[in-house]
A protein has these predicted regions:
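Conserved S/T- and glycine-rich ATP-binding loop of Class I adenylate-forming
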Residues: 23, 65-68, 101, 119, ...
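Flexible, low-complexity linker/hinge segments
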Residues: 2-5, 39-60, 85-86
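Conserved pre-ATP/AMP-binding loop-to-beta segment of ANL
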Residues: 11, 50-64, 71, 94-100
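Conserved ATP-binding/catalytic segment of the ANL
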Residues: 212-261
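Conserved AMP-binding/adenylate-forming
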Residues: 1-37, 103-106
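Conserved AMP-binding A3 loop
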Residues: 59-87
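AMP-binding/adenylate-forming
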Residues: 47-51, 76-155, 179
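Gly/Ser/Thr-rich phosphate-binding loop
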Residues: 144-147, 151-197, 202-204
């Protein structure tokens, strides 16, 4: 039977995770619908992503870019890419079976859904909330959480072993247990942690300052069949950066329409 793209249109929670596993077990790919969209916008997004239509064998996810500087694109991530991202991230963070992931960011964005896929691939305890709520986050008992700067300011950070921080420039006074990430939907979440690439990730800074990335967690293609990855496997991010004296990557700014997550 030809695999197809199946939408999950429900808030985060145990049922969402059950849906992901059920769809994958059937050989299909998952498209998580943004719960913040009104009904008309949801319908338009489902059409754009061609929900219900065929996908390739091995495709796991289609994730929508935010479209903040252009029309949202459907990023196709394979099971191999999702696994590579989960394994590299878990290795960098030193995740063990004693850890407990908390997902509280929108699951329609790769920064939120990647928490779920990491936990599933590493068999780590997982709590999925329908959204960010300060008390629920603080009292979750989780050891690992992915946040953005605006949510970081609203919690007690010392309650977590490690906080994975994405979504833009980190605050100057960030807690010592935070790890800053750089990545995008097309890279299946963060691929550079505190300026250092994850295992298997290559970085090239071109003469004009544009950051290029290569690694096993990159997208297969966009939903329309086009691909931003060149013949040698490099993804031009549209972001500008430079190498610091200590060998870490510093991201200076953005150009183009790819979205930092």
């Amino acid at each position: 039977m030809t695999p197809r793209l199946v939408a999950i249109d429900r808030p985060g929670g145990p049922e969402f995770v059950d849906d992901v596993l059920r769809i994958w077990d059937a050989g299909d790919a998952v498209f998580p619908v943004d719960q913040r969209l009104p009904a008309e916008a949801k319908s338009a997004q489902l059409r754009t992503m061609r929900v219900g239509e065929a996908v390739e064998e091995g495709d796991a996810l289609v994730m929508a870019t935010s479209g903040s500087t252009g029309t949202p694109k459907g990023v196709v991530l394979t099971h191999d890419a999702v696994t590579a991202s989960a394994e590299a991230t878990s290795a960098r963070l030193g995740v063990t079976h004693e850890d407990h992931w908390l997902a509280c960011l929108p699951l329609s964005h790769v920064g939120g859904l990647s928490v779920v896929t990491r936990a599933l691939h590493t068999h780590t305890r997982l709590t999925v909330l329908p959204g960010f709520e300060t008390t629920a986050v603080d009292e979750s008992g989780a050891t690992l959480v992915s946040l953005v700067a605006t949510t970081l300011r609203r919690i007690h950070p010392e309650r977590f072993r490690t906080i994975v921080l994405g979504g833009g420039r980190p605050p100057a006074d960030r807690p010592p247990n935070t790890v800053t990430t750089y990545g995008m939907t097309e890279t299946g979440s963060g691929v550079v942690y505190d300026g250092v690439p994850l295992d298997g990730v290559e970085i090239d800074v071109a003469a004009d300052g544009e950051i290029r990335l290569r690694g096993p967690m990159l997208l297969r293609c966009y939903r329309d069949g086009s691909s931003p990855v060149d013949a040698d496997g490099w993804l031009a991010t549209g972001d500008l950066g430079r190498w610091l004296d200590d060998g870490r990557l510093h991201v200076d700014g953005r150009r183009g329409d790819m979205i930092v997550t």
